[in-house]
Amino acid sequence: MLKENFIAVLQATSKAAEVSCNEMLSDSKRLEVVDARSVAIKILAEAGYCPCRIARFFHKTEASVRHTLNNFELRLESNKILEKILQNTRKILANK
């Protein structure tokens, strides 16, 4: 069940951000990929997944996941595209 939820969020975010799932799971620093990965991490955290589980799924450190979560609202204020990706991902997930 856990893996299916991660995959559903990953696929929904991939579709909303127009970034491949493989790119989101990579170490890419491209802004589009970072935005998509950040949205997926935020949604998973809101769903109750702990940073250590999210980190394992994305092959990141727990510290990098916490950093993403701690800075998400600040990035959201200055990045309207990030807000749109978040909204669209939530819509896609709500329709599943």
Language model region names:
Residues 1-96:
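Basic, alpha-helical nucleic-acid-binding regions used in initiation and control of genome expression
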